[in-house]
Amino acid sequence: MAILPVRRDDSYHQDIAERLIFESGRPVLIFPERPVRRLATSFANIAVAWDGSQPAARAVGDAMPFLRRASRVRIFSATDDKPMPSAARGREIAQQLASEGVDVIYEEVKKTDRHTIGSFIESYVADHNSDLLVMGAYGHSKLREFILGGATRSVLMNPPGWIMLSH
């Protein structure tokens, strides 16, 4: 695992972080160089951003040492008015973690139009005072991310605290 500081709105360091995430084959633990709030010294309250993707599943697997030691794990999915096909798998992951003794809940949270997926994730982490955000890193073309926004790039540009990313 690589541990790496990132600076808010610093594309040079964010590009280094992205290369490590997408090319190393290992999870990357990121923290803001100048955090807005005090960084946790242990990961007791963990948020897992779940979208049903292979990178999200890999992130959960990579984070197991942290998840087993946590006091509370919240797996959350962003929803809109349509049913989420990933919801069933999210509940299964939560049940599996619970069977291993992890204090875990799964919840689907409605994402409003005023939030990008990145700002939605950042708000969730802040609202639940999460010590660590675990999420899969998914890469889009730079043009698509520029137009639509991307969760990975967004949290790298504005890290809410400790983030563990896996691809």
Task: Annotate each predicted stretch with a short phrase.
Residues 3-19, 135-154:
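Glycine-rich, Arg-bearing micro-motifs that act as flexible, cationic patches
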Residues 52-107:
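Redox- and metal-dependent alpha/beta enzyme cores, enriched for Fe-S-associated oxidoreductases
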Residues 12-13, 55-56, 85, 117, ...:
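Secondary-structure boundary/capping motif
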Residues 1-76, 158-167:
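Intrinsically disordered or low-complexity boundary/linker segments at protein termini
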Residues 132-137, 163-166:
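Conserved active-site loop/cleft motifs that coordinate metal ions or position small ligands
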Residues 88-91, 119-122, 147-152:
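Charged helix-capping and loop-helix junction motifs
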Residues 124-130:
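Glycine-rich phosphate-binding loop signature in dinucleotide/nucleotide-binding domains
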